[in-house]
């Protein structure tokens, strides 16, 4: 007999994961539903009113913040080296360098080395074989084995570092998936079958979205833009990429980290959330790209901060710890954080689990109406975790007047949430997306809501898979911190625990992150992700990321493939 665990409050019904997986497999075998409207796709392609903002910053390669860059391979040069410089000429990856006027080589940049793959793909450039004195050796870097976990593998961490440095995906590292054995790691795109049938129109094209494009007609880059308001009223807001930054409050991360994220969001024409810790004045120049969050603790919530922004988010629950409320331990509550939150310095802060003023959809609607009365130009987002009845929650938020439903599954968060909560309470996001998408279609309201997904979104491929399952876009967080060289050590809850100055409020450690450096690293990562999304769309013969929504026919479940 299976053990059933009930969580008081949000998860009103127990979740049986075997049942969820069975329903999920059936969904992947079903016909696509809830596809985007033709006129919306056409708008994304033409941008007639100029609502889709341009991306204003280009890739600018940036070195890591610290002298010792983590690497997968270690390159060593023995005393047998005669400094002939042949390796400098041969290596196309910049591992070796000898400044003009010097006879000696500089120490090799091991992080640029692609290891044995070089011998396989570029034998004429493989330094180990070409060195006249056999002075070069390449071996696995010992610290590589200590990095990461099954969800964020060492390869995925290093690949994200490299994309944040160069704006391009590294060929020698696995940057698409992790090794968790579940979640998005068990889902793959069926590119091979689509390459065979490229002349066949996709279902979205057959619904009148234009003629299918062959190889010779793909002259324009696919659009990655999505709308954030599908209601017939309210401001029409588009973002040029299908993601924005999730809530990380002042206190959970440093002000420098918040500034880095805000500047990157502005450069990419998208948004980033303040989290529940208030709205620091340093973010005021980025008002048009900020989402201010109203959570159950109401920390730092003021009418003037609601009036500053274009999107206001109600956080009813967090996928990493649903039913537990927000936690900020005493170490991180410095004088500035306490002032922002209206609390006492070095006292732990706990948000209650529910809004004690909301016990029905009608109460929820009063919240939404309050925001609209305070700021008529703001869109309203509702962030919920993923209980078994999350589909009903989403419909309730629709009737309360929300523009955006933000589903937050388990495995999200920076590391401060208890592991037992992250791994055992919320429904995984890949199960929640189809459940909500399908129910909204059945209710006839899918084309009036924007469905954003978060909770373990690590890569551009995760974003694309979430959209193919039925989401409109994704909300990201940890990946941005990894771009700032987070190594996922898990010390986020401590005031001086983060050695990189990311998730800390210590005034000295915070200075390790220069906002301009951090912003450009995130911008570079975003460029790499967008390029990967464009490649995915081109492989599938799609003109817009909007065409990918609900297209489960381009996905395959890895367990299913093993069965055949």
Language model segments and positions:
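Electropositive phosphate-/nucleotide-binding environments in soluble metabolic enzymes
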Residues: 78, 85, 121, 125, ...
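Conserved, well-structured core domains of diverse proteins
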Residues: 2-74, 79, 95-111, 128-203, ...
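Secreted/processed peptides and extracellular or luminal domains of membrane proteins
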Residues: 87-93, 97, 119, 124, ...
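Glycine-biased, low-complexity coil/linker segments
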Residues: 207-211, 215
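Anionic ligand-binding catalytic core segments
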Residues: 509-528
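Glycine-rich phosphate/ribose-binding loops and adjacent secondary-structure elements
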Residues: 1, 69-73, 83, 88-89, ...
């Amino acid at each position: 007999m299976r053990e059933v665990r009930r969580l008081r409050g949000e998860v009103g019904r127990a979740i049986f994961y075997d049942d969820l997986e069975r329903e999920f497999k059936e969904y992947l075998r079903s016909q696509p539903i809830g596809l985007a409207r033709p006129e919306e796709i056409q708008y994304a392609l033409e941008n007639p009113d100029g609502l889709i903002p341009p991306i204003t910053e280009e890739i600018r390669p940036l070195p890591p913040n610290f002298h010792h860059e983590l690497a997968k391979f270690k390159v060593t040069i023995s005393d047998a080296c005669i400094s002939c410089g042949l390796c400098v000429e041969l290596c196309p990856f910049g591992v070796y360098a000898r400044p003009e006027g010097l006879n000696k080589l500089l120490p090799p940049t091991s992080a640029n080395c692609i290891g044995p793959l070089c011998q396989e793909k570029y034998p004429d450039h493989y330094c180990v074989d070409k060195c006249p004195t056999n002075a070069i050796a390449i071996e696995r870097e010992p610290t590589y084995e200590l990095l990461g976990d099954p969800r964020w593998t060492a390869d995925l961490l290093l690949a994200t570092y490299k994309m944040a440095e160069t704006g391009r995906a590294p060929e020698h590292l696995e940057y698409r998936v992790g090794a968790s054995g579940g979640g998005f790691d068990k889902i793959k795109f069926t590119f091979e079958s689509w390459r065979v049938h490229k002349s066949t129109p996709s279902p979205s094209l057959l619904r009148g979205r234009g003629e299918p494009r062959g190889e010779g007609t793909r002259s324009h880059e696919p659009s990655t833009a999505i709308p954030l308001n599908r209601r017939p009223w309210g401001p029409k807001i588009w973002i040029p990429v299908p993601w924005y930054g999730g809530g990380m409050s002042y206190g959970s991360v440093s002000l420098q980290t918040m500034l880095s994220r805000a500047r990157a969001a502005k450069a990419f024409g998208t948004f980033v959330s303040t989290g529940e810790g208030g709205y620091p004045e340093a973010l005021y120049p980025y008002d048009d790209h900020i989402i201010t969050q109203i959570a159950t603790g109401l920390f730092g919530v003021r009418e003037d901060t609601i009036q500053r922004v274009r999107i206001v988010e109600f956080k009813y629950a967090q996928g990493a710890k649903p039913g537990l409320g927000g936690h900020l331990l005493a170490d991180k509550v410095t004088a500035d954080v306490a002032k922002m939150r209206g609390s006492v310095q070095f006292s732990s802060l706990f948000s209650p689990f529910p809004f004690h003023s909301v016990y029905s959809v009608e109460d929820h609607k009063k919240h939404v109406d309050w925001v609209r009365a305070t700021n008529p130009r703001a869109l309203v987002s509702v962030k919920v975790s993923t209980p078994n009845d999350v589909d009903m929650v989403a419909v309730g938020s629709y009737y309360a007047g929300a523009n955006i439903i933000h589903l937050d599954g388990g495995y999200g968060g920076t590391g401060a949430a208890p592991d037992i909560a992250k791994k055992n309470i919320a429904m995984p996001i890949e199960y929640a997306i189809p459940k909500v998408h399908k129910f909204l279609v059945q209710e006839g309201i899918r084309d009036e809501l924007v469905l954003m997904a978060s909770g373990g979104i690590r890569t551009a491929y995760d974003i694309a898979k979430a959209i193919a399952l039925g989401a409109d876009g994704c909300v990201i967080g940890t990946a941005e911190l990894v771009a700032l060289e987070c190594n996922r050590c898990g010390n986020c809850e401590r005031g001086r625990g983060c050695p990189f100055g990311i998730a800390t409020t210590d005034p000295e450690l915070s200075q390790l992150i220069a906002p301009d450096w951090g912003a450009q690293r995130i911008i570079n990562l975003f460029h790499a992700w967008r390029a990967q999304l464009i490649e995915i769309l081109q492989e599938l013969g799609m003109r817009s990321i909007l065409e990918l929504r609900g297209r489960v026919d381009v996905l395959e479940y890895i367990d299913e493939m093993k069965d055949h």
